[in-house]
Each structure stands twice: as C-alpha cells, then as structure tokens.
Amino acid sequence: MALISMRQMLDHAAEFGYGVPAFNVNNLEQMRAIMEAADKTDSPVIVQASAGARKYAGAPFLRHLILAAIEEFPHIPVCMHQDHGTSPDVCQRSIQLGFSSVMMDGSLREDGKTPADYDYNVRVTQQTVAFAHACGVSVEGELGCLGSLETGMAGEEDGVGAEGVLDHSQLLTDPEEAADFVAKTKVDALAIAIGTSHGAYKFTNPPTGDTLSIQRIKEIHARIPDTHLVMHGSSSVPQEWLKIINEYGGEIGETYGVPVEEIVEGIKYGVRKVNIDTDLRLASTGAIREFLAKNPSEFDPRKYFAKTVAAMRDICIARYEAFGTAGNASKIKPISLEGMFQRYASGELDPKIN
C-alpha cells in the first residue's frame, strides 16, 4: 500500500517542478473520481478531510474510504491529509487514526473563527510539529487569513474561517513573518494568504494582480525556498458548470475563481499543494441536476452518481495535467513513516531560510 507523507510527495514535486492538487473528499464518488483520474494520468494523490467532511462522514469512515482507494490502486502514492485542524488535539487524533499528514491552522483560535495572534499560532504549531514529526507525519501550517482582497471579507469553509471584514495586512502573508514562522515551527508546508478565499464566491470579476497577489508568492518563496507553499481556496469555478447548474434550476450568481494559469505561475515559485473543493462540488451538482431534468422518471441514485464521477474525474484529470502532476506517480519510491521519522530526527529535513 502506497500511503506516504505529504513531505515526501511535495519534496518530489519541488525537485521536478510540479504542483499537486489536494482534493477534499466527502464520499465514495469523489474518492473514485480522484483515483480514476490519477490512475489515468499516473499522478500522485493528496486527498484531504476537511472539518466539514469529518463532521459529515466522520473521520473513521473517511479513513477507511481512503484506505480502500489505496488498496484498489496500490501503484498510486497517496497522502491522507487532515485539513484545517483547529487544535493540536484534533491533529493528534487524526495521527492516531492513521493520517500521514495534518494541518494545524493556528491562524485562528480553537473556535475556527477568531483570528489568532502570531505567538499563539507559533505555539500551537510547534506543539503539533513536535508530536507529528516524531511519528513521521507531515505538518502544514497557516499564516494569514483567507479572504478577498477585493472586498476585505473573510472566507469560510465548513464552519472554519475568520468572520467579517479583515484588514489588508491579515489578507496577505508577510514574507519576513513567514520566514520567522518557519524557522520557529519547522513546518513542512505553509498555507499563505494571497487573496484567495473558500467557496464559490471568490471574485466578482476575473481576478487581477490587485485581487490575487502572485507577486507575494514570489516574495515568500525567495525567503523560504525549501518550504512548500500551499494555496487554499484555489478552485477555478468552471463557468460551464455554473451555466449547467443554472440552466437546470440552480440560482448561483455571477462569480469567478482562481484561473488555472495563475496557479501554474504560482507553481513556478514554490506552490506545491493546491487545495480544490468547490470545482468538484459544482461538477457533481451540475451533473445531478442535468441528469434528473432529462430523466424525470429515474430514481436509482447509482445512475446519477455515476454521472458525478465522470464529471469530477474530468476536472481532476485537467488539474493533474495543468499542474504537471501527471506522469510522476510511478517515479516516487515510497518511504515509510518510520523512515520519515529518521530523516526528521537527523535534522536532514530542517528548513532553509534565506
């Protein structure tokens, strides 16, 4: 079984200059779409359980869903990642369940809504890194708050995210603070704030440099070249699926996501993990609406669920190809979590700060 750490996967991505889409998973259909796309394109996989997914399906169910995928596709390296942990305890529980990577989101207090101060973020992230690395498990941290540079509004996903209007400094990660944070915590990956937000309503117009700061990615990467950067809220919000949803009874207003070409530009400057959820939700919803509208007498869920798998699989394939992930699964030689622990303990994986 090819369950590997996020650190190993992203180190490989950095060495060969590609990015890895990290898809949220809630159910069988999403899991199958992701794995079938990876199988077709020879792509390594990061699947993640968000706070909402853990509440909806339960972490043990998600764990076994992911392990089943690994069993069926043993040739595909898979990282099982816990997204947006709101406390070290949450992360510790995920490690006990067998997750190979966790995110400690110390940018927010334990309620998942109140922006935290810097010292709190450092402290809880340090705690998480200490016990995670002792198990060979990777840790993603976060610095800055997700939200729109266009409106100043914070972004929320599945009950996790700051509330209300944030100031500009909170919405853009400071490169010097990022360097200090990585030096103190030794996180493997860092989620940064550059103007993206969770959900479908990211931008009211196609984003520009004023609302999506690729320049900030470049500045942060220059300071912490060996730390893998993470873009959250990076769905592209396919306009074709918005059109289908609204054509068959939906009421989603005009909205735009993060253009794929902007993500590709970010990958050139250290972005290695790209979080995607909304795109799969839109494709799934559109496929169901269209099928039921065209087949009003059908009531077998397997028939419309099969349509969702195909729709989501196409998006996954497109992202694997665009981000350069395709063709790399077979090149990764899995390292056990015990092996990763030995590398952490030796200091081999300590971050480099410029």
UniProtKB/Swiss-Prot annotation:
Residues the entry annotates as binding dihydroxyacetone phosphate: 199, 233-235, 275-278
Catalytic activity, EC: 4.1.2.13
Residues annotated to bind Zn(2+) 1: 84, 198, 232
Any Gene Ontology biological process: glycolytic process
UniProt keyword annotations, A-Z: Glycolysis, Lyase, Metal-binding, Zinc
A single GO molecular function term of this UniProt record: zinc ion binding
Positions bound to Zn(2+) 2: 105, 142
Catalytic reaction annotation: beta-D-fructose 1,6-bisphosphate = D-glyceraldehyde 3-phosphate + dihydroxyacetone phosphate
Binding site for D-glyceraldehyde 3-phosphate: 50
Matches recorded under PROSITE patterns: ALDOLASE_CLASS_II_1 (PS00602), ALDOLASE_CLASS_II_2 (PS00806)
Keyword Zinc-finger part of the UniProt annotation: no
Active site: 83 (proton donor)
Signal peptide: none
Entry superkingdom: Bacteria
Family under the similarity heading: Belongs to the class II fructose-bisphosphate aldolase family.
Record-linked NCBIfam families: cbbA, FruBisAldo_II_B
Name the UniProt record assigns to this protein: Fructose-bisphosphate aldolase
Organism from which the protein derives: Stutzerimonas stutzeri (Pseudomonas stutzeri)
Lineage summary: Bacteria, Pseudomonadati, Pseudomonadota, Gammaproteobacteria, Pseudomonadales
Chain's gene name: fba
